[in-house]
Amino acid sequence: MATVKKKLDAGQFNLKDQVVAINRVTKVVKGGKNLSFAALVVVGDPSAAVVGYGSGKAKEVPQAIRKGIESAKKNLVKVNLSQTSIPHQVLGRYGSGRVMLKPAPEGTGVIAGGAVRAVMTSAGVQNVLTKSIGTTNPHNVIKATFEALKQLRDRREVAAGRGKTVEEL
């Protein structure tokens, strides 16, 4: 049976936004070309380990970014952290994209590129090793990263699932 996660309220967090990609799109019509912009935005509160992503489309770049931020605030995810890193290694898949997240010792930093780095820093992860495999499309890379983050379980959740205490693990 699937568990229902409660929706996180964006108002209770100090969210910082980060633009991952801006795409200029042209639609050819009878009278010429219509220009518009699409923005991919990641928002997060590093102190609360909350992160979300969204995309916005508009005729101007600032409006597209604003719409992306509003969209990102609607799908926030709580990230399970173990001190400054992630608790265990995970592999997120979306489309042809694969993103591997691996815990790292203190002082390593965020070893990630592009879209994955934006998600990790926004989520408050300070030490992690990542590898993005397959697609370079930032939309699919971010979605694969979020699939990986949703798989993270801390020691208490694992112990509860096995019917044991944390000390028994």
UniProtKB/Swiss-Prot annotation:
Q: Which residues form the S5 DRBM domain?
A: 15-79
- UniProt-listed Gene3D superfamilies: 3.30.160.20, 3.30.230.10
Q: Which keywords does the record carry? A: Ribonucleoprotein, Ribosomal protein, RNA-binding, rRNA-binding
> What GO biological process terms are annotated to this protein in UniProt?
translation
Recorded superkingdom: Bacteria
Entry-linked SUPFAM superfamilies: dsRNA-binding domain-like, Ribosomal protein S5 domain 2-like
State the GO CC annotations: small ribosomal subunit
A single GO molecular function, which one?
rRNA binding
Keyword Cell membrane appears in the UniProt entry: no
Record's Pfam families?
Ribosomal_S5, Ribosomal_S5_C
Give the record's family classification: Belongs to the universal ribosomal protein uS5 family.
Q: What does this protein do?
A: With S4 and S12 plays an important role in translational accuracy.
Q: How does it assemble?
A: Part of the 30S ribosomal subunit. Contacts proteins S4 and S8.
The domain comment in this protein's record states: The N-terminal domain interacts with the head of the 30S subunit; the C-terminal domain interacts with the body and contacts protein S4. The interaction surface between S4 and S5 is involved in control of translational fidelity.
Q: What is this protein called?
A: Small ribosomal subunit protein uS5
Native species: Koribacter versatilis (strain Ellin345)
What gene is this protein translated from? rpsE
